[in-house]
Amino acid sequence: MKIALDVMGGDNAPDINVDGAKRALQDFPLIEKIYLVGREETVRSSCDRWGLSGPRVEIVPAAEVVEMNESGLLAVRKKKNSSMSISVDLVKSGDADAVVSAGNTGAAVAAATVKLRLLDGVERAGIVTQLPNEFGVCNVTDTGANPDAKPRHLVGYAVMASILARSVYGKQMPKVGVMSNGSEDEKGTDFTKGTFCLLKHLEERGALPFKFVGNVEGHDLFEHEIDVALTDGFTGNVLLKTCEATAKAFSKWLKEELKANPFRMVGAACASGAFRAMKARLSADSVGGSPLLGVRGVTIIAHGSSTPVAIRNALRVSMEMVQQGVNPLIEEEMARLGTIPEVAEVYPK
């Protein structure tokens, strides 16, 4: 298995990527080779610093870098020799089985969608982000690929994310819900109601490869066994960033309160193990990155502030998706499902 890594992607590139690649190669013998894509001298210097060399790594020169503040689609069109574009090209040519990037999310989505194209039966690609909950993780989709979506697109997201939940996260019959402002069937906007109606219609036909649990609220993602939560890319991205900010704020406030009193500091020292465990549970490092489902090639988009551990785990997730054949399973299930109807075709007004 060969993976292309955009070494210039991320706030702390290239070192976090090179260090992460080294950790992945040490831990996962199934990875035959990692292509380190970026400015050659920069990548080579980083490899020297981290002691990364050998037949399982290959530096692929890329003269340009897509910056975090650039327009995604425009950057892909203008910077054809960027580390991100060339990383995706390696998947397109068949030289790599997957691509991992902690760079500009919009550019990563555009590059993968334009260059790799969509899988058969897929209308829109969607980003799936894992949020920790009492039962492992909740796969939230879409978290940023398509701000404007139609109900039938969310049905496609449901199929793809449920396959990910089953293949990579071990959920034999994933529980899928539509994010709404209440759990009652009639709650929500026309968009969420339409999604609910389509899924209910397909459930009654016995066409769903997962258990549809209806509408779910924000707290359900953390308190109940919801394996996949469906929403549009705008709402999903707001949810994701709110969760990230809340976790950071809670950590900051807790530290401030503990430091305000020496007796609290003594208690904190006694509970240091619990604090470390909680930090690990809330950290995105264990997840690694968010899969972009629906494109012809495994694509993982890591957070811009990823650590080496996160990059290592993003490479792991890409490896597991290739190993489990997630994309062929998506095409197979979408073919079985057939054309997804419009809401008006199922429930005419």
Curated annotation (Swiss-Prot):
Pathway connected to this protein? Lipid metabolism; phospholipid metabolism
Q: So what EC number does this one have?
A: 2.3.1.274
Which Cys residues form disulphide pairs?
none
Reported function: Catalyzes the reversible formation of acyl-phosphate (acyl-PO(4)) from acyl-[acyl-carrier-protein] (acyl-ACP). This enzyme utilizes acyl-ACP as fatty acyl donor, but not acyl-CoA.
The protein's location, in the record's own words, is: Cytoplasm
One GO biological process term is: fatty acid biosynthetic process
Q: Reaction catalysed?
A: a fatty acyl-[ACP] + phosphate = an acyl phosphate + holo-[ACP]
Q: Which gene encodes it?
A: plsX
Oligomer and partners: Homodimer. Probably interacts with PlsY.
Q: Which SUPFAM superfamilies match?
A: Isocitrate/Isopropylmalate dehydrogenase-like (SSF53659)
Name of the top EC class for this enzyme: transferase
Q: Which organism is it from?
A: Akkermansia muciniphila (strain ATCC BAA-835 / DSM 22959 / JCM 33894 / BCRC 81048 / CCUG 64013 / CIP 107961 / Muc)
Question: One GO molecular function term?
Answer: phosphate:acyl-[acyl carrier protein] acyltransferase activity
Q: Where is this chain primarily localised?
A: cytoplasm
Reply yes or no: does the keyword Chaperone apply.
Answer: no
HAMAP family documented for this protein: PlsX (MF_00019)
State the name under which the record lists this protein. Phosphate acyltransferase
Would the keyword Lipid metabolism be found if you checked this record's keyword annotation?
A: yes
* Gene Ontology CC annotations of this record: cytoplasm
Q: Which N-terminal residues, if any, form the signal peptide?
A: none
**What family does the database annotate?**
Belongs to the PlsX family.
**Key words of the record:** Cytoplasm, Lipid biosynthesis, Lipid metabolism, Phospholipid biosynthesis, Phospholipid metabolism, Transferase
